[in-house]
Design a protein with these regions (language model features):
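Short, compact, well-ordered microdomains
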Residues: 115-119
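A surface-exposed partner-binding patch
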Residues: 1-103, 149-153
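Generic hydrophobic/packing signal
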Residues: 29, 49-50, 98, 114, ...
Length: 155
């Protein structure tokens, strides 16, 4: 992780080896008929329920929330099974949380990658680790991110 990523995570209450009770997240997944992948369970156990806040040039407060429970309120498993098919990313997308005051939704996918979706576009593949996801979100390093709108010609 970049130093900036670590600073922002620690300022939000994260510590290395952090473990939290993710039963509310597991319950939301179960109610939607979804089975949480083990890698995502490990991610939530360490990073779940964090809200990363920071000031951008002292004018704006950015906020990233790692709690997908509200994302399930109006959706079911079927809604997430083909979410990225237009990008030729087939399989199930699992909600992780929100970024930039809700303008972006963070997902984990069957293919082992994290993704960020912005309405109306684009979709970014953010790598297979929390490091690559967080470095791009709030650590100043998007080197592992791929804009799938550009890659697939959907822009």
């Amino acid at each position: 992780m970049t130093e900036l990523t670590l600073q922002r995570l620690k300022a939000s209450g994260w510590t290395p080896g952090r473990k939290v009770d993710i039963s509310p997240i597991e319950k939301a997944y179960a109610e939607a008929g979804m089975v949480m992948p083990e890698k995502l369970r490990e991610f939530f156990t360490e990073f779940g329920f964090l809200t990363i806040r920071y000031d951008i040039q002292h004018t704006e407060l950015e906020r990233h929330t790692l709690n997908p429970v509200s994302d399930f309120l109006n959706y079911s498993k079927e809604d997430f099974e083909h979410l990225f098919d237009d990008y030729e990313v087939f399989g199930t997308a699992y909600p992780v949380g929100f970024a930039y005051r809700g303008n972006m939704t963070i997902y984990y996918h069957d293919d082992g990658n994290f993704y960020i979706f912005m309405e109306p576009n684009p979709l970014y593949r953010c790598g297979k680790t929390a490091d690559s996801l967080f470095n791009g979100l709030f650590g100043g390093d998007k080197s592992e991110w791929v804009n799938l709108d550009e890659e697939t010609g959907l822009l």
